[in-house]
Amino acid sequence: MERQYRNHLSGYLHWDQLVHAEDWLLFEKNIGAYICIDEVALSRGELYTVLTNKEAHGGKGSMIAIIKGTDVHTVTSVLLKLSRRRRYQVREITLDMAPNMEQIARICFPAAKRVTDRFHVQKLAYEAVQEMRVKARWEALDEESTQIAYAKACGKMYHAPVFANGDTRKQLLARSIYLLYKKESLWTQSQGIRAEILFKEYPDIKKGYYLSMRLGLIYHQCKFKDIALTRLARWYDEVDKSGFLTFGRVARSIQTHYLDIINFFERRATNAAAESFNAKIKAFRAQFRGVRDRAFFLYRLAKLYA
């Protein structure tokens, strides 16, 4: 039935982009003033670069380009096929912190302001806190292993010390994973108790947690670029004083992209449209239980979103 639809009813065999469909698709008429770029795993982990028009709100006319691979040369060689007039119409492009995406945006859309997605910036800070937690957990596991070996050598049974909430040290560190991603006001009662114990035992994790939350507050509270710049400068100072290596790496990444990060405060634009479109592609793929014929899958995708 599907073969019948594919070969006779769909118009797929007469598609003007069939020859290069697996490598790239372009829909120049869909370019708008506000666009976003991201990558998606189409099938079997094969990455494609997707360019979408925000003003289409995930419906028809959303897809501008879908290109196999994320290499700068490959992607730009396709996007430069778009007319210069159209490319210079783009006023803003949102993207993540990947250097290849930044290069693609700069080469293909030179007149557009680049905006680094706020969620990718905040994610760096959250991951820095998690790195501190994981390091502490490994240390706790090593300590427990040493204590077990010592007890065994003495012919005794080892009993791990338990905190007031019933967690052992390694359980405390393992079970704190989710609360460190959340605002303090969103903790449940049990998470609040666990956080209190965690922060008492590991003051560095407490400092790291509040550093990550303060970065989020800059995005939430600041409405103007100059105020955001001042607040970010203060945040850098706090990171320097903390001496945390994990946050030092975060601060350096932010400094590298700070011009694109600060552009967020003009229109508060995020890459949510790209993430949403990627989710639609994955849902469409799941509906057909995977991708057997990649070119035909892209044809159907184009019919819906291009």
Where are these regions (language model features)?
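Short secondary-structure boundary/capping segments
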Residues: 8, 51-52, 107-113, 129-134
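A short hydrophobic/aromatic micro-motif that marks alpha-helical segments and, especially, helix-coil
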Residues: 12, 53, 135, 290-291
